[in-house]
Structure formats: C-alpha cells, structure tokens
Amino acid sequence: MKRLSVLFALVASPALAASGPFFSLRNTDFIVTLAFLLFVGILVYFRVPQIVGGLLDKRAEGIRNDLAEARRLREEAQEIYASYERRQREVKSQADDIVANAKREAVAEAEKAKKALQLSIERRLKAAEEQIAGAEAEAVRAVRDRAIQTAIAAATEILGKQASPAERSAGIDKAIDEVAQRLN
C-alpha cells in the first residue's frame, strides 16, 4: 500500500505543476492519471500481480529443477567418464602385458629355433665327419688292398724266379696267413 501511495504522489506531481484546474475533464494529465489508476486498480482487483508472481515462482521452480537435473546429469557424466578412463587404463595395461608376453614368447621361440638350427648343424657336421671317416677308412682299405696285391704280385714274381714250386706254395700259404692275421 505504501508503494501505491508513493506511486500516486509521483504520478500526480507533474499534473499539479500544469496550468489550469487539475481536476477537470478537459485536463489531459488528469484523464491519463485516472486511466492509469483505473488500470492499476483492475490489475489488483483481478489479482494479476499474484498470478504473475505465481507464474514466475513456477518458472523459478522449473529452472531450479532443471538445474538440479543438469547437476545430476553432470555428476553421472563425470562418473561415466571416470569409469571410461579407468577402463582405458586397464585396456592399455592389458595391451602392454600382451605386447610384453608376445615379445617374451618371440624371444623364446627365436632361442628355440636357434638351438634347433644349432642341433641340426651339429648333426649334419657329425654325419659329414662320419662320412669323411668312412671314406677315409675306405681309402685306407683300398690302398692297403692295392699294396697287398702289389706285394703279392711282386713276391710271386720274385719267388717264381728264385724258388721251387714247393717253396712257392709254402710261401703263398704263409703270406695268406699273414694277410689274414693283419686284416682281422
């Protein structure tokens, strides 16, 4: 009510300063003041300020609810983001573990392959050495056989010229026995 009184006083002050009688229907300032007061009175009578205040209160409550919902959604989004970051760290850790395991397995497989290759090379070298030893023994045997044959031929020729048939036969038997003993 105090506000309304102050409003009337402020509205009436320019009208009082005008020339001529103020409370005349010919005075436009008076008519405007009356119309304004009538308008304000109608607004108050129909409780428009209360309705507008109620609408504003409802709107403010709606905004508060929207802000609360926004806060809740923000917190939920932060929780989801934090869980995704944790999951990403876990996945990165798992990926690092997988890479480390793969490297270890690759090194182990390389070592296995290296050992297998080394064993294969050793087997081949041993087989080659055995083959060389066999060829060497065969060559020694061949040389020995050739030397024996040459010695027999030379002995036969020498004995054939110097010895009688009975001596030759005894010499051949003796030589065969010697050769048999040496070969065994």
Curated annotation (Swiss-Prot):
Record key words, sorted: ATP synthesis, Cell inner membrane, Cell membrane, CF(0), Hydrogen ion transport, Ion transport, Membrane, Transmembrane, Transmembrane helix, Transport
Membrane-crossing segments per the record: 4-24
Taxonomic lineage of the native organism: Bacteria, Pseudomonadati, Pseudomonadota, Alphaproteobacteria, Rhodobacterales
Name assigned to this protein: ATP synthase subunit b
Superkingdom of the source species: Bacteria
Location of the protein in the cell: Cell inner membrane
GO terms under cellular component: plasma membrane; proton-transporting ATP synthase complex
Native species: Paracoccus denitrificans (strain Pd 1222)
MF (Gene Ontology): proton-transporting ATP synthase activity, rotational mechanism; proton-transporting ATPase activity, rotational mechanism
Family to which the UniProt record says this protein belongs: Belongs to the ATPase B chain family.
Gene that encodes the chain: atpF
The protein's assembly and partners: F-type ATPases have 2 components, F(1) - the catalytic core - and F(0) - the membrane proton channel. F(1) has five subunits: alpha(3), beta(3), gamma(1), delta(1), epsilon(1). F(0) has three main subunits: a(1), b(2) and c(10-14). The alpha and beta chains form an alternating ring which encloses part of the gamma chain. F(1) is attached to F(0) by a central stalk formed by the gamma and epsilon chains, while a peripheral stalk is formed by the delta and b chains.
Any Pfam family matching the protein: ATP-synt_B
Function comment: F(1)F(0) ATP synthase produces ATP from ADP in the presence of a proton or sodium gradient. F-type ATPases consist of two structural domains, F(1) containing the extramembraneous catalytic core and F(0) containing the membrane proton channel, linked together by a central stalk and a peripheral stalk. During catalysis, ATP synthesis in the catalytic domain of F(1) is coupled via a rotary mechanism of the central stalk subunits to proton translocation. Component of the F(0) channel, it forms part of the peripheral stalk, linking F(1) to F(0).
Alphabetical list of CDD domains matching this protein: ATP-synt_Fo_b
